Structures are given as C-alpha cells and as structure tokens.
C-alpha cells in the first residue's frame, strides 16, 4: 500500500450535502478494496486561480489515502466521470501528516479575530 494525497474541486453550485455524498462514494471505493482514508479536509468555497469553463469558484477538498495504485486509478476514473468535479490532482507522498494542512492552518488564522492589546 502507498500513501496518496488527492485534492479535488467541486462546482460552486453543489451543496455541502452533495459534496459529503461524493466523499462517501470515494470512501466506499477505497474501503471496499482494503484501503483507508487517513485524512479528510474541506477547505471551503474558494476563488479559482483562473476560470475553468464557466466556473470562477469551487469547493476544495483534500483526501489522504492509504491504498494501492489500482484503487487510486479507479478513484481518479470516478473523479473524471463525475460532472460535479471540475479538477483533481492525486500525488504519491511518503507519509500523511496528522497536522492540518498549511491551507487549513492559514484559513483558521484568517478567521480568528485579531485583538489589539496596545490600545488603552
């Protein structure tokens, strides 16, 4: 078994419930083939770096996988066939960290209010 990180972008008009169904379908494929999802991160609705088709925004999702290359290929095939997924990228990695990804860390610090302690 190998470790993979897969990031996919779902169309902006898809609901969070539908995104959860997509992730559940991917989880089922992996678990049915003796693999495991080690990490799941929803990065939120973000602006795309460039327009893809008619899309300017998308829901970003990261999956950390422990599976075989054949199952990874099947997962990528399902991503290609899913009309709600506008882009995806899967990379082989040496290990999957339990820490939040840098994007998720940055997102959580952006949402944290800054308190000015110098003002009296």
Swiss-Prot record:
Tell me, which GO biological process terms does this entry list?
translation
**Looking at the keywords, is rRNA-binding present?**
yes
Report the InterPro entries cross-referenced here: Ribosomal_bS6, Ribosomal_bS6_sf, Ribosomal_S6_plastid/chlpt, Transl_elong_EF1B/ribsomal_bS6
Which key words tag this protein in UniProt? Ribonucleoprotein, Ribosomal protein, RNA-binding, rRNA-binding
The molecular function terms of the Gene Ontology recorded here are: small ribosomal subunit rRNA binding; structural constituent of ribosome
For this chain, the family text in UniProt reads: Belongs to the bacterial ribosomal protein bS6 family.
HAMAP family hit by this protein: Ribosomal_bS6
Q: What is this protein called?
A: Small ribosomal subunit protein bS6
* Organism the protein comes from: Rickettsia bellii (strain RML369-C)
Its lineage reads:
Bacteria, Pseudomonadati, Pseudomonadota, Alphaproteobacteria, Rickettsiales
């Amino acid at each position: 078994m190998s470790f993979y990180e897969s990031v996919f972008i779902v169309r902006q008009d898809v609901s969070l419930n539908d995104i959860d169904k997509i992730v559940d379908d991917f989880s089922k494929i992996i678990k049915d083939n003796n693999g495991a999802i080690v990490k799941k991160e929803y990065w939120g609705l973000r602006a795309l770096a460039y327009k893809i088709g008619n899309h300017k925004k998308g829901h970003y999702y990261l999956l950390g996988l422990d599976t075989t290359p054949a199952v990874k290929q099947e997962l990528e095939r399902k991503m290609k066939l899913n009309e709600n997924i506008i882009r995806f990228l899967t990379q082989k990695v040496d290990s999957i960290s339990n820490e939040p990804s840098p994007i998720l860390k940055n997102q959580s610090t952006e949402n944290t209010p800054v308190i000015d302690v110098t003002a009296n």
